[in-house]
Amino acid sequence: MQRHLISAADLTRDDAVLILDTAEEMARVADRPIKKLPTLRGRTVVNLFFEDSTRTRISFEAAEKRLSADVINFTAKGSSVSKGESLKDTAQTLEAMGVDAVVIRHSASGAPYRLATSGWIDAAVVNAGDGTHQHPTQALLDAFTMRRRLVGRDAGLGKDLDGRRITLVGDILHSRVARSNVDLLHTLGAEVTLVAPPTLLPVGVETWPCEVSYDLDSTLPKSDAVMLLRVQRERMNAAFFPTEREYSRRYGLDGDRMAKMPDHAIVMHPGPMVRGMEITAEVADSDRCTVVEQVTNGVSIRMAVLYLLLGGNEPAVSHARPIEEK
């Protein structure tokens, strides 16, 4: 493992499998009466969020606290950033406080890389989402969910997703989740297909390690997992499709379309979902939908990432003693 986690593309196959295997052990903590390990006791982790977040911020905070880290939550609103303070000044302030790791979400693509390589701060940096660029821990938790469902919890240990067929549907253009998943799933040996209207595909997508299709119905019968992506209107300044109804008709997943998928196939969504647009309530509430599992798995993945970045060399959680209740 490198010192930072900035992009899913930076991970080797062995790195990714190590994280997934470590997360499998971290998941056992959730079954304990006391959901806590002493692994990062005495370490300080800062959640540096310049962009609104619910799931990711809470997930990281839960992961940090379960590892016994000291947690500092920073949001741009109400801080000196709202008064014009730069990322450099903020980083140097955190450096002066002696933090060990920074989890950063930023609207500017490349901000986590800048923080990690600038020399402003001597700490591990984890990218929690930067603009439309990358969201590596989301890709890892998605791959973790796929491996658990498609290979098995115990059977999946040490294994990747070789030969699995994954379909990503929706707003690829504005999605850091799509980019991260394509990078990681390719590294893990999966075959990825993107399905979207031409207006929601980025320039240069033909160079990505995946296939591109405009026909969802022809792709579904060949998919082991289908991941639906929200249309990110907050990043749009023009009309990318005629109407929501037309988009849903061509690219939304309903019960009839889900029936075309293989019996073992799963439906995924990184959240937040827009029911009635990219996914119907029937599909979202079905047993094949893994949205809630993804949230649960996100905590385990982020525990694994923090553990490995801050000194862990191998999956050793099963040998660690839980903190005794006082």
Swiss-Prot record:
Q: What does this protein do?
A: Catalyzes the condensation of carbamoyl phosphate and aspartate to form carbamoyl aspartate and inorganic phosphate, the committed step in the de novo pyrimidine nucleotide biosynthesis pathway.
Query: One Pfam family from the UniProt entry?
Result: OTCace_N
- Keyword Transferase in the entry? The reply is yes
Indicate what this protein is called per its UniProt record: Aspartate carbamoyltransferase catalytic subunit
Q: Which family does it belong to?
A: Belongs to the aspartate/ornithine carbamoyltransferase superfamily. ATCase family.
- Name of the gene: pyrB
Pathway(s) this gene product operates in, as recorded in its UniProt entry: Pyrimidine metabolism; UMP biosynthesis via de novo pathway; (S)-dihydroorotate from bicarbonate: step 2/3
Q: Which domain of life is it from?
A: Bacteria
What keywords were assigned to this record?
Answer: Pyrimidine biosynthesis, Transferase
RNA-binding among keywords: no
GO terms of biological process kind? 'de novo' pyrimidine nucleobase biosynthetic process; 'de novo' UMP biosynthetic process; amino acid metabolic process
Q: Which reaction does it catalyse?
A: carbamoyl phosphate + L-aspartate = N-carbamoyl-L-aspartate + phosphate + H(+)
Q: Provide the residue positions that the database annotates as binding carbamoyl phosphate.
A: R55, T56, R105, H135, Q138, G271, P272
